[in-house]
Amino acid sequence: MIDAAQIDHLTALARLELSPAERRTMQQDLTRMLGYFEQLGRVPTEGVQEMQRPVSLVNVLRDDAPGETFPSGVVSALAPETQDGFIRVPRTVDTE
């Protein structure tokens, strides 16, 4: 079971400020999670071969082949604003 000192330590590391109710909930949730790990630790695994990956490495992507595209004039005509053949869009990343 997780005790109050461990909750204090975890909240300090995570820089969390929790109400008493949130602390109780966190303590209960973490205790329950650790209980699940204890259950997993008791599963008999003798004779079970370890896996490097849970799934086989198979490329499920299609071949990269050129296909039909729209002429640039059609796409540019649909864009609200263009400049030098490129579509202008609002800035999404600050450079500062």
Swiss-Prot record:
Belongs to the GatC family. This is Glutamyl-tRNA(Gln) amidotransferase subunit C. It is an enzyme of class 6 (ligase). It catalyses: L-glutamyl-tRNA(Gln) + L-glutamine + ATP + H2O = L-glutaminyl-tRNA(Gln) + L-glutamate + ADP + phosphate + H(+); L-aspartyl-tRNA(Asn) + L-glutamine + ATP + H2O = L-asparaginyl-tRNA(Asn) + L-glutamate + ADP + phosphate + 2 H(+). GO terms for biological process: glutaminyl-tRNAGln biosynthesis via transamidation; regulation of translational fidelity; translation. PANTHER family: GLUTAMYL-TRNA(GLN) AMIDOTRANSFERASE SUBUNIT C, MITOCHONDRIAL. It holds the Pfam family GatC. The keyword Protein biosynthesis applies. Allows the formation of correctly charged Asn-tRNA(Asn) or Gln-tRNA(Gln) through the transamidation of misacylated Asp-tRNA(Asn) or Glu-tRNA(Gln) in organisms which lack either or both of asparaginyl-tRNA or glutaminyl-tRNA synthetases. The reaction takes place in the presence of glutamine and ATP through an activated phospho-Asp-tRNA(Asn) or phospho-Glu-tRNA(Gln). GO terms for molecular function: asparaginyl-tRNA synthase (glutamine-hydrolyzing) activity; ATP binding; glutaminyl-tRNA synthase (glutamine-hydrolyzing) activity. Keywords: ATP-binding, Ligase, Nucleotide-binding, Protein biosynthesis. The keyword ATP-binding applies. Its EC number is 6.3.5.-. Heterotrimer of A, B and C subunits.
